[in-house]
């Protein structure tokens, strides 16, 4: 590169960029290599479709301006941005080594992962650089919100940089991002998402990135996130209900994990603590014993870049039509597939989610997943109750009623029938027989309600029914996951789980004290 070309500012003229191979894609964006003629330099251009983006350009440009002021060797450099028709083009540094996810897939495809995908020294070297980048972001009041192998890029010299900082998350929130350090926006990929981000109750801070970092550490060793086989809603349930995942979670062949030692496992467990306050900061993690195994970038260059697929090899695997957008996107073969903002339909979790969607019997129950990952801020007030349902709700009273008010969602022609005791084998043969249930909880006026409804195995889904209860204004939107999880528990084992009491994510208000007996901050779901 000549001195003259290097001194030139980055062009904002579309004609100065020659688009080349597609090297990555998501539902709302495509990333292409390009050649910038005035600068005589190859770059990466992320083309974001603005068609469905609710963010004003003024707000979006402010965020990009803040992003462009981030200068760190472990953060991908953003050069400039401009609008081309209905797309926002982000011009970035091209890292020709691709993502760590590309390398993981390449190793797995060649069958070279039987003893673990990457060794400890390689993992430590990559993750130390990621921590340096996260420490910089966190010190500057920024949260990445989507740390994963697919967003860790490698340069041909073995350098490591974090990508997709800022803009993807900003677009997903409709621009509703303040500069404070606590977020209440629901963005990120479910498998890597921290529990507090899923709960949407207290908001979250930079410690959410530390959880995602821990999941990424597992991904680099095993080749996938712990719950990668499950569709998004199931991932949310497992993360919230189960103990934190570990290196062994979901791995059938434990032999592949034998070479990973105690310090690596301990580092992961520190990151994956459900209480974010107990997780270490990026700066504290950098002092962890495990990172003494880290080498330099020449080590990465020799160790894994020689095994990595080339840009042209990676580009052949991108099947989505560039420029397609939306939650349901069209593929090259003309079919439609669902994904979240940056969902990789080649990944295991992508396949599971798409399979879940295709098996949905009705559009009504498919919508729950689409709404869960919509750009709208999920932290709004309780949904308004439609008039036809509000007529059945109890009227305001000075004291809480001794008997719960009855709210029925059962079809008028088919009154609720008591579920008869049947063996699990008999029930599986009679999948069309509905289970009558009652959800008892307090409404916004603190009055007890009994909400009666039916669940038909083989037709209904727990998340679909829960979404309907929320849409009817009977359940707080923040309780979607916890209600769905307990409904799933009952319908899977109706004989052993005829009634469950559980804590609500929406919690209690003011001076109220949670009480599972009086159902203050709790709900009860039973087979009637």
From Swiss-Prot:
Record has Transferase as a keyword: yes
Catalytic activity line of the entry: L-seryl-[protein] + ATP = O-phospho-L-seryl-[protein] + ADP + H(+); L-threonyl-[protein] + ATP = O-phospho-L-threonyl-[protein] + ADP + H(+)
Chief place where the protein resides: cytoplasm
Compartments, as annotated in UniProt: Cytoplasm
EC numbers for this chain: 2.7.11.1
Key word Flavoprotein present: no
Any GO BP: intracellular signal transduction
Residue(s) carrying N-acetylserine: 2
Post-translational changes noted in the entry: Phosphorylation at Thr-185 by WNK kinases (WNK1, WNK2, WNK3 or WNK4) is required for activation. Autophosphorylated; promoting its activity.
Biased composition (Acidic residues): 334-348
Activity regulation info: Activated following phosphorylation by WNK kinases (WNK1, WNK2, WNK3 or WNK4).
Gene3D superfamilies in UniProt: Phosphatidylinositol 3-kinase Catalytic Subunit, Chain A, domain 1, Phosphorylase Kinase, domain 1, Transferase(Phosphotransferase) domain 1
Biased amino acid composition, Polar residues: 396-406
Gene Ontology CC entries for this record: cytoplasm; cytosol
UniProt binding sites for ATP: 23-31, 46
Role noted for this protein: Effector serine/threonine-protein kinase component of the WNK-SPAK/OSR1 kinase cascade, which is involved in various processes, such as ion transport, response to hypertonic stress and blood pressure. Specifically recognizes and binds proteins with a RFXV motif. Acts downstream of WNK kinases (WNK1, WNK2, WNK3 or WNK4): following activation by WNK kinases, catalyzes phosphorylation of ion cotransporters, such as SLC12A1/NKCC2, SLC12A2/NKCC1, SLC12A3/NCC, SLC12A5/KCC2 or SLC12A6/KCC3, regulating their activity.
Family: Belongs to the protein kinase superfamily. STE Ser/Thr protein kinase family. STE20 subfamily.
Name of protein: Serine/threonine-protein kinase OSR1
Organism name: Rattus norvegicus (Rat)
């Amino acid at each position: 590169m000549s001195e003259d070309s290097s001194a030139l500012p980055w062009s904002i003229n579309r004609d100065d960029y020659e688009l080349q191979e597609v090297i990555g894609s998501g539902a709302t964006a495509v990333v292409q290599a390009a050649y910038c003629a005035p600068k005589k330099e190859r770059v990466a251009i992320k083309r974001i479709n603005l068609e469905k983006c609710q963010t004003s350009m003024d707000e979006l440009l402010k965020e990009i301006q803040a992003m462009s002021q981030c200068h760190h060797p472990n953060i991908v450099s953003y050069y400039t941005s401009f609008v081309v028709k209905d797309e926002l083009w982000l011009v970035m540094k091209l890292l020709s080594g691709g993502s760590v996810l590309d390398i993981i897939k390449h190793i797995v495809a060649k069958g070279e992962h039987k003893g673990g995908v990457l060794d400890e020294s390689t993992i430590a070297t990559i993750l130390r650089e990621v921590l340096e980048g996260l420490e910089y972001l966190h010190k500057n009041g920024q949260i990445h919100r989507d740390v994963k192998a697919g967003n860790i890029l490698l340069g041909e010299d073995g350098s490591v940089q974090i990508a997709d900082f800022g803009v993807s998350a900003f677009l997903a929130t409709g621009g509703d991002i303040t500069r404070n350090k606590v977020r209440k926006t629901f963005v990120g990929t479910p498998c890597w998402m921290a529990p507090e981000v899923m709960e949407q109750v207290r908001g979250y801070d930079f410690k959410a990135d530390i959880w995602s970092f821990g999941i990424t550490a597992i991904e680099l060793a095993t080749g996938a996130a712990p719950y990668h086989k499950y569709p998004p809603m199931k991932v949310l349930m497992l993360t919230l209900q189960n103990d934190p995942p570990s290196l062994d979670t979901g791995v059938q062949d434990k032999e592949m994990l034998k070479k990973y030692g105690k310090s690596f496992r301990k580092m992961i467990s520190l990151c994956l603590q459900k209480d974010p306050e107990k997780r270490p900061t990026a700066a504290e993690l950098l002092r962890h014993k495990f990172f003494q195994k880290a080498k330099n970038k020449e080590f990465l260059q020799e160790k894994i870049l020689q095994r990595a697929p080339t840009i042209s090899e990676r580009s052949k695997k991108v099947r989505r039509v560039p420029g397609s957008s939306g939650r349901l996107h069209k593929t090259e073969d003309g079919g439609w597939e669902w994904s979240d903002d940056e969902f990789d339909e080649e990944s295991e979790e992508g396949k599971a989610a798409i399979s879940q969607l295709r098996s949905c019997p009705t559009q009504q129950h498919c919508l729950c997943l689409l709404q869960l990952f919509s750009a709208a801020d999920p932290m709004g007030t309780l949904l308004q109750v439609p008039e036809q349902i509000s007529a059945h709700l109890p009227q305001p009273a000075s004291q809480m009623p001794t008997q719960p008010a009855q709210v029925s969602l059962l079809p008028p022609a088919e009154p609720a029938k008591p579920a008869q005791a049947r063996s699990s084998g008999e029930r599986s043969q009679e999948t069309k027989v509905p289970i009558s249930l009652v959800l008892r909880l307090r409404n916004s006026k603190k009055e007890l309600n009994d909400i009666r409804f039916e669940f038909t195995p083989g037709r209904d889904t727990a998340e679909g029914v829960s979404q309907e209860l929320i849409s009817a204004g009977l359940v707080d939107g923040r309780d979607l996951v916890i209600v769905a999880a307990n409904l799933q528990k009952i319908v899977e084992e109706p004989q052993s789980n005829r009634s469950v009491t559980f804590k609500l994510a929406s919690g209690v208000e003011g001076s109220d004290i949670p009480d599972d007996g009086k159902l203050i901050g709790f709900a009860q779901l039973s087979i009637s």
